Curated annotation (Swiss-Prot):
Name of the protein in its database record: DNA polymerase III subunit alpha
Subunit record text: DNA polymerase III contains a core (composed of alpha, epsilon and theta chains) that associates with a tau subunit. This core dimerizes to form the PolIII' complex. PolIII' associates with the gamma complex (composed of gamma, delta, delta', psi and chi chains) and with the beta chain to form the complete DNA polymerase III complex.
InterPro entries xrefs: DNA_pol3_alpha_NTPase_dom (IPR011708), DNA_pol3_alpha_thumb_dom (IPR041931), DNA_pol3_finger (IPR040982), DnaE2/DnaE/PolC (IPR004805), DNAPol_HHH (IPR029460), NA-bd_OB-fold (IPR012340), NA-bd_OB_tRNA (IPR004365), PHP_dom (IPR004013)
Pfam families for this protein: DNA_pol3_alpha, DNA_pol3_finger, HHH_6, PHP, tRNA_anti-codon
Role description: DNA polymerase III is a complex, multichain enzyme responsible for most of the replicative synthesis in bacteria. This DNA polymerase also exhibits 3' to 5' exonuclease activity. The alpha chain is the DNA polymerase.
Documented EC number(s): 2.7.7.7
Entry similarity comment: Belongs to the DNA polymerase type-C family. DnaE subfamily.
Gene3D superfamilies attached to this UniProt entry: 1.10.150.870, Bacterial DNA polymerase III alpha subunit, thumb domain, Metal-dependent hydrolases, Nucleic acid-binding proteins
Subcellular location: Cytoplasm
Organism this protein belongs to: Streptococcus pyogenes serotype M6 (strain ATCC BAA-946 / MGAS10394)
Amino acid sequence: MFAQLDTKTVYSFMDSLIDLNHYFERAKQFGYHTIGIMDKDNLYGAYHFIKGCQKNGLQPVLGLEVEILYQERQVLLNLIAQNTQGYHQLLKISTAKMSGKLHMDYLCQHLEGIAVIIPSKGWSDTLVVPFDYYIGVDQYTDLSHMDSKRQLIPLRTVRYFAQDDMETLHMLHAIRDNLSLAETPVVESDQELADCQQLTTFYQTHCPQALQNLEDLVSGIYYDFDTNLKLPHFNRDKSAKQELQELTEAGLKEKGLWKEPYQSRLLHELIIISDMGFDDYFLIVWDLLRFGRSKGYYMGMGRGSAAGSLVAYALNITGIDPVQHDLLFERFLNKERYSMPDIDIDLPDIYRSEFLRYVRNRYGSDHSAQIVTFSTFGPKQAIRDVFKRFGVPEYELTNLTKKIGFKDSLATVYEKSISFRQVINSRTEFQKAFAIAKRIEGNPRQTSIHAAGIVMSDDTLTNHIPLKSGDDMMITQYDAHAVEANGLLKMDFLGLRNLTFVQKMQEKVAKDYGCQIDIAAIDLEDPQTLALFAKGDTKGIFQFEQNGAINLLKRIKPQRFEEIVATTSLNRPGASDYTTNFIKRREGQEKIDLIDPVIAPILEPTYGIMLYQEQVMQIAQVYAGFTLGKADLLRRAMSKKNLQEMQKMEEDFIASAKHLGRAEETARGLFKRMEKFAGYGFNRSHAFAYSALAFQLAYFKAHYPAVFYDIMMNYSSSDYITDALESDFQVAQVTINSIPYTDKIEASKIYMGLKNIKGLPRDFAYWIIEQRPFNSVEDFLTRTPEKYQKKVFLEPLIKIGLFDCFEPNRKKILDNLDGLLVFVNELGSLFSDSSFSWVDTQDYSATEKYSLEQEVVGVGMSKHPLIDIAEKSIQTFTPISQLVKESEAVVLIQIDSIRIIRTKTSGQQMAFLSVNDTKKKLDVTLFPQEYAIYKDQLKEGEFYYLKGRIKERDHRLQMVCQQVQMAISQKYWLLVENHQFDSQISEILGAFPGTTPVVIHYQKNKETIALTKIQVHVTENLKEKLRPFVLKTVFR
């Protein structure tokens, strides 16, 4: 029977449409018993192909296509692994090829267990190679020219499932080669997956011996994987068990903990670790963290369930005492649930490459590698790549891809988005392109590198998996799942920005304050830091900076660190339903149900609410007598909602509880509660470790806010300016002679750096800093290198006021810039001896200057116009920070954004405003009636007095606006004798509606009144109308 050997898969990137799952399915439909893959150079899909075939009842045949230079000739070879030994040879051959090291001598040394096929298209009778081979023939091979001494074998290339796929493969070739469709060669036909019986009949008729050769070749092929654990030996000169025991005992003694119950807990953990064969693993992790600390890196408090291990704590792998904080080792490692321990190594992200080099040097470049991942055609990428080949311009591509949401597939966005569907259906070529994009969506596009994963082995990695070359170290061809399935140790080296932040803050405090802070020793009950959490002032704090977490903190108002840990667990679907119960029980407003005195100590810290997975385990241990190992199996069954296992466990739980004298009804009720909570219960060890890191960050924000914002603004891509301003920091004006490159904070002043100016070359910024001081605008331009004498570089410097120290009129400098540049280029160094004729012009207003600064660096650097308005205001208003819910208030604000919607009931327009008063932000709602009145006045960036009712929603204050008044510093002042003509004046003012506030001063009783319901448009006509009734009018 025919066997399909030469199948290119999607791992021959953009040269095939054969994905493995559909390959198995179609192969069975077409009657195949044996199928193969033969990707070019690589074995990316080999493991999943072999396992998938075995699962689907198919015989796998693993092949590899390589081209090799021999006797000044490129020879194309198809290599077939005939057995497990051949499989291992292919691992080495592919690695050599993907590392640029494959040559004929190496190949010949690794052909044991491998059959070689040379396709007939690449064969000639002059070809002489130092090994036996088959000649691969297809339906179109002219057999009359074949060497009668050579064995023939059927070999048909497959790249797609059906002829309809040819157009899509043609598109993939165009994308791969970055060509238009017209420039891309047409795809070969007859490379679809054909019916097995038809091909069998063909070869039986035309070349029966070739078919027999094929059957003989594949008949005994079988591959076996070695899945045994292959941990590297940490120290070959000493027992790992002994070394681990010595190090952990020394660690506890150093911490002053060589006492009970620590000693017995340590012995218990060491026995389990040794019995499971993981002594070397812990020593390796310890060694890696020791390396980081020896370099002065802050390595964090650990993460995940590893924080429940006393061995990890004794080795300083984690920074949490699991005995003191009641964390469970069995949640981490359990003899009744054999799995690799999973200790992720957190490290400052800027030092990750240093760790990779250490691993490579310490354990050997042949014994360690990074792990591959595969970048796929996402919906946006597929649309962009395909539509571009149909000649769609960039702006149309951008508009189309903007309609695709983060979680959308092309099918879902087409179904739910009317505008997207309209664009696709607007042209025939768009419909065609969309069909192709859907076909390639999800297929691998290229390789990438796992963000964290490193694989390590006791022996050479290529004995087990294929590799390819990389920058810092070799990279696996197998993904993380296949790597671990082959018994190899995968470790995650997670570069965390937050560790970088903490370390940089520690260093800056030492430099600026002369204070050495031991991060790991920060008091987790520090009152000032707890107060920060209670206020929800956690922008920039790991795990707590999203609105949901901030609002939850404001509700819970944590009073101790344990409640911060609880907040991370309550901030999850399911658990959040119990937030109100948690708060009321803590405040004594709701009864705490501890169910049974025997489990009361377990539930008391969380007020009778099961928040943590460990609580479920402890209850099973105490109430039903389960071992913690067995309790962990129960926890896993509940988390995974394994109904069959849970039912079995429930009967076991109740029987064991009854044996201990518990009531059956109570036991069943307790089990149901455990079952419910375990579905979303959080890992307490992980919550504790990450809350500790969050607390450390918050400690710096609470005690050293200038240091905190300095580091966050310079090392984070997020915007912390608004948060800093709300914390009473101010953005200071800088000059060309004082502006730093990075942001700088001193004495509550923020000095924005040159790095914030979009599009400013770094080299130009460095040049400015090195060359200053400058004496004038002319001096600066004269000395500026010609390559930087461009308006695109110079205008932003002028707009943010860097030359105000020489010439405060920014508009004047900008208007004269063309002339200045011509003058500089014509006179060069003579500029200083000549006089440039400046053309005068009126400067920007303060508001315009502030807007220019926001445009260039994202924040105003000069005095905020709103501050000037506030200083001159005669109208009373309340700062946003002092608003009280359920009160009437007037606020003086600037509108940041306006969002207009239509109500569902009446279809009328209403608006949501986001506003600020330079210190804090506020959400404002204008319902249809108010919006209809004021909509023509509202404009983003303008200043207003808003009057309304203060409400609370989602634990945040917002205003329901009733009245809007423009807040401009210019007012129309009327001086009148007395109140005699008030009605006439009011009538005249009402006839000239506008946005200028009116203030009336009564000379007789010295009374001044700002009109709240009348604003005017000031004209000469208005002035004439008022003349008979007023002593004087002033517009200022």
